Amino acid sequence: MKIFLAAEDTGAIKEVVFDEGMDTSVQDGPQPLITSFAALGKLKHIQKLALVTTSKGTKYIAAARKNGTIEVYPYLLTEESTPIFVYSAEGAEKCPWIGLTQYDDNTVVAGLEDGRLFFLDVSKVTIESDKPYDAPTASVKGPLACFALDRELYPGKIAVGGKERDLEVFGWAVKGDEVTVRSEFQARNVKSNEIDMRVPVWISGILFQASDKDGFRVITATRHGQIRVYETWHGKRPKWDFKVTKDPLRTLAPGMDASNVVSSDAHSSTFKFNFADNEKIVLKNKDNNQNKEHNRKSPCVVEKFPGSLGAVLHLVTTDNGLLATVGLDRYLRIFDLETTECTAKMFVGTQVSSLLFVDTERKTAQEKHVEETAEKEDDELWNDLDKVEKKSNKRRVAGNDEGKKKLKSA
């Protein structure tokens, strides 16, 4: 398996290749293969990472840095790797990146806290990397803390939110150099509390889910410890507003199915939260280690993921039931989503500002390393052959020109 990390201390991309069962706290145990690339220092550290796959199947790594640039790297990184393309957004060095993800087959979208979104056509910039590029840009009301999209469920839709910026879903259309944006859903805050005080808004995570009716189903996590479920046919206020914890929620990711999500707070808890009503669920009894079936009619925290010392800052889930987390203790942990068992634990030695799970196939780290080394050597060989062919073509053209000159002089 392979994960890319953004190292805040050095500004590098760290590639971690590992097996399930690894634990770096065991001195004589197997160790992951950790390699650093593109270290530009803390002042230019990466705030967001994204994997981009073009319509032709070519993969790239996109990185949004603190200095306001977006860099595009080859997927198979080497110690000599440099960006294929660098885009500088005006004024972005004064404003943090709050999101970076693939928008469509060839486009990556990057968002700033001030509400600006940039759409970069990776297929274009990697071919014409030496030419000036002006990314199509549009703005929405800020400040934003996060944005989300789901290319399969709701293509062309992006949801945004932030501090005193309630959930809003926009429809986007990118044609050439122009971007058009239209608001399609604006959430309303919940009603005032029992002492008639306004409930504050501070969205920290957004997640689209499949809808069985026309409209959107959107989940949000907040810095006030709430998880909210919006169904647009239900109304502009959340269908559910559940207080999960007293601590701020920092993350939000899909669970095993549409009935649950995974989140973490600013203390040390990472948990599965189930919000499907009128169903039977199985909860573990920690006293006797036996499972018991319960009828549940309201959302609840199902199970917690153990082990983290301090806040989990970033997490990501995979389609094959894995959860990866990194936190203040500088450990990368891998969990089984269903059982909550920790299947790998690795000290990465840096504060992590972004996390990208790019390969969930359960091969051994050594097998993966051998495969990728062979791929890199093949790429280098083809590049060398291309260079030789270009040189021979130039010589052939030069020889033809010289021959023509001699014929004319004769």
UniProtKB/Swiss-Prot annotation:
Localization terms from the record: Nucleus, Nucleolus
Feature: compositional bias, Acidic residues: 374-383
GO cellular component annotations of the record: nucleolus; preribosome, large subunit precursor
Any one biological process term the GO annotation gives: rRNA processing
Intrachain S-S bonds: none
Keyword Mitochondrion (UniProt): no
Chain segments carrying region Disordered: 366-385, 390-410
Keywords, comma-separated and alphabetical: Nucleus, Ribosome biogenesis, rRNA processing
Main function: Involved in the biogenesis of the 60S ribosomal subunit.
Family affiliation: Belongs to the NSA1 family.
Oligomeric and partner information: Component of the pre-66S ribosomal particle.
Protein name, per record: Ribosome biogenesis protein NSA1
Annotated source species: Yarrowia lipolytica (strain CLIB 122 / E 150) (Yeast)
